[in-house]
């Protein structure tokens, strides 16, 4: 996928500083910060607009639903989206598994395919067994894949339907989406993480330009 490199000029390139736009189809404000983690600048941006009485996507509540692993998985499941089997633990898990921290001090999860270092990893991710972790079971022959979701669209046709679901269910405009692809061809929605405007490829930027407008 082509990315815009520093110094390369693209006609009509999106300015990463202009992160609040309006959806052309509805006029609703959209937060294009890319990182919607709790207490991030993107979180405060939506909070300020909400406190001013504006409707903006995503809301602070929607950010929490999307960025807290068990909330994300349960919301997806209730919406009829395929997700992996998962459980919450304070240290114990069986491989192969994806382990995501729930605590606000540890952001990066781990993929554990063998049980050799499971105890050490569990101790680290739980901050010495203080915080819980969300454990997603990896099915036999399952493969972990990633795609980028931009306003419900993906460069890859394979993931466009799932990208649209992420947008419609979670209201997250920009996201790096993790899925587990099973042996029978199913894609299990697993996680979403930040994706910034400045990291978008040329086709992704053009898609943004086609679907949003700026007030100035």
Predicted regions mapped to residue ranges:
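Active-site flanking residues adjacent to catalytic metal/cofactor-binding acidic residues
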Residues: 99, 177-179, 190
